[in-house]
């Protein structure tokens, strides 16, 4: 096993160890939890398999965790799949026919399924039936196979890329939003307890403030602060130690990292504050378009550092102030919109 593979395996085990089992352990997203709890409990009281669920929103907010929670709540098995792996009907068939009654079938990145596979999924979702082609050529025939009733849970960072026929087949649909600092702090309290990490309240709040509203990142930063404190601070984890540990990762007090700063300074230094197209930015900062749109832009827009216009991305006055730059082009560009 290579070092890189070993680290990835360790990270996966780390994430799984902190995954909440039930909704009572899932902090934040309060309105979503209330709706989902009602939706699942109502189906269970009627003795029915819950309807299909779609969770969408930025990466790292808990979509996969919610799929596990749905399976845990209904007390059934969970079958995992990824959209990019489901291109042809044959890619789906084995998974669908292996499902037991009430199982939860989770498809991550469901927007990346192949079109033919997606259309094959429609009858499975609606009628719990699929058609199988037997033989080939002139003697080919289609046989309809019954499936055990199941709950499909789809997750996507790009709900706009889902086709209307697929989207409308989900009985429950909810967007996950970025978490507040307080919600992230509660998550970190739970995580530190599970990991046996002793950290004071100020340290956990400092980590929460720099976690971009994202639990996955918060938990990874907690682990980094633990390692930093172990080597540099005699295992003492307070607010000052957390601040030093995160500064070592080049994460500032707004949660902006090296790529965020590079993105903002590139727009300011080379494009006079914008507007500039996403393709041009992708080349300039050395990140692919999907990463910029899914990982970096949503947080920068949420915090008010950039805005999207018909002509491209522009930095805001807040970005100039944060970077201590003079906004030479901001007024004229704003008047031109």
Swiss-Prot record:
An example GO CC term for this entry is:
Holliday junction resolvase complex
What's the short name of a Pfam family annotated to this entry? RuvB_C
Q: Does the keyword DNA damage apply?
A: yes
Q: Origin, by domain of life?
A: Bacteria
* Residues engaged in binding DNA: 308, 313
Compartments, record wording: Cytoplasm
- Note down the stretches annotated as region Small ATPAse domain (RuvB-S): 180-250
CDD domains documented for this protein = AAA (cd00009)
**Which parts of this chain are annotated as the region Large ATPase domain (RuvB-L)?**
1-179
Q: Which SMART domains match?
A: AAA (SM00382)
Q: Kindly indicate whether the keyword ATP-binding belongs to this entry.
A: yes
Task: Write out the residues that bind Mg(2+).
Answer: 64
Catalytically driven reaction(s): ATP + H2O = ADP + phosphate + H(+)
Ligand binding (ATP): 18-19, 60, 63-65, 126-128, 169, 179, 216
Head domain (RuvB-H) as annotated region, ranges? 253-337
UniProt keyword list: ATP-binding, Cytoplasm, DNA damage, DNA recombination, DNA repair, DNA-binding, Hydrolase, Nucleotide-binding
A GO BP term here is: DNA recombination
GO molecular function annotation = ATP binding; ATP hydrolysis activity; four-way junction DNA binding; four-way junction helicase activity
Q: Which HAMAP family match?
A: DNA_HJ_migration_RuvB
| Quaternary structure and partners | Homohexamer. Forms an RuvA(8)-RuvB(12)-Holliday junction (HJ) complex. HJ DNA is sandwiched between 2 RuvA tetramers; dsDNA enters through RuvA and exits via RuvB. An RuvB hexamer assembles on each DNA strand where it exits the tetramer. Each RuvB hexamer is contacted by two RuvA subunits (via domain III) on 2 adjacent RuvB subunits; this complex drives branch migration. In the full resolvosome a probable DNA-RuvA(4)-RuvB(12)-RuvC(2) complex forms which resolves the HJ.
Query: Any idea what job this protein has?
Result: The RuvA-RuvB-RuvC complex processes Holliday junction (HJ) DNA during genetic recombination and DNA repair, while the RuvA-RuvB complex plays an important role in the rescue of blocked DNA replication forks via replication fork reversal (RFR). RuvA specifically binds to HJ cruciform DNA, conferring on it an open structure. The RuvB hexamer acts as an ATP-dependent pump, pulling dsDNA into and through the RuvAB complex. RuvB forms 2 homohexamers on either side of HJ DNA bound by 1 or 2 RuvA tetramers; 4 subunits per hexamer contact DNA at a time.
Supply the domain comment: Has 3 domains, the large (RuvB-L) and small ATPase (RuvB-S) domains and the C-terminal head (RuvB-H) domain. The head domain binds DNA, while the ATPase domains jointly bind ATP, ADP or are empty depending on the state of the subunit in the translocation cycle. During a single DNA translocation step the structure of each domain remains the same, but their relative positions change.
Q: Which family does it belong to?
A: Belongs to the RuvB family.
Name the UniProt record assigns to this protein: Holliday junction branch migration complex subunit RuvB
